[in-house]
């Protein structure tokens, strides 16, 4: 564990970092994962969380973590530099196809219609993974608990009414950081088989970041071996945090070193090296 007295004087100096016990990897079959967790959660405000995200951390509810797996560096934190981003042909088509969607931004809040869409999405896209059985309480802990500057965005299709109201197509949770937007989680209508809601959502976030004059959209972790993560490599240029530095990735050539050597070279925010 990293103790507060071991960190330089900074807003991060009150945080502690510890490694979890091993657990089955959610993304790569047969792999064992560990996480490095930043605590206590009540001290992690938006400014501190921005620095943690720059160092490869993410959050799930109020739980802030980064991968800390023995001998594996498959999870690469990635972000899109919005001013340099150039959509490809498929992305331009997705943007045009879903131009009828109307986005409404609001504080995090529970809505029964959102939860119903979440459960439909999990049952269709992640059946058997556990999240398809999430209770309302689990849903709220995962997506609606935050101590930082977070927003909920719902996307409705005004051209396709449902039961007399505009159809809910997608919901996205987004964190607003000091240097960008961080995509927390997005779920959408799984019955629209020809839709490109996920792609459209990232394009929408890129446009929002530009309008807010924020340089990046953080997309979480990209895993080359995971088909579920493949879509992130379609956004160019894509920057990844490798050996403690953000650099433009060539997704076909990324070859990462073992985690122990890499984390030894990758300092925690404030200049302190990662420890166990």
Curated annotation (Swiss-Prot):
Keywords: Acyltransferase, Cytoplasm, Transferase. GO terms for cellular component: cytoplasm. The keyword Cytoplasm applies. It catalyses: N-terminal L-glutamyl-[protein] + L-leucyl-tRNA(Leu) = N-terminal L-leucyl-L-glutamyl-[protein] + tRNA(Leu) + H(+); N-terminal L-aspartyl-[protein] + L-leucyl-tRNA(Leu) = N-terminal L-leucyl-L-aspartyl-[protein] + tRNA(Leu) + H(+). Disulfide bonds: none annotated. InterPro entries: Acyl_CoA_acyltransferase, Asp_Glu_LeuTrfase, N-end_Aminoacyl_Trfase, N-end_Aminoacyl_Trfase_C, N-end_Aminoacyl_Trfase_N. It is found in: Cytoplasm. Functions in the N-end rule pathway of protein degradation where it conjugates Leu from its aminoacyl-tRNA to the N-termini of proteins containing an N-terminal aspartate or glutamate. HAMAP family: Bpt. This is Aspartate/glutamate leucyltransferase. It comes from Burkholderia thailandensis (strain ATCC 700388 / DSM 13276 / CCUG 48851 / CIP 106301 / E264).
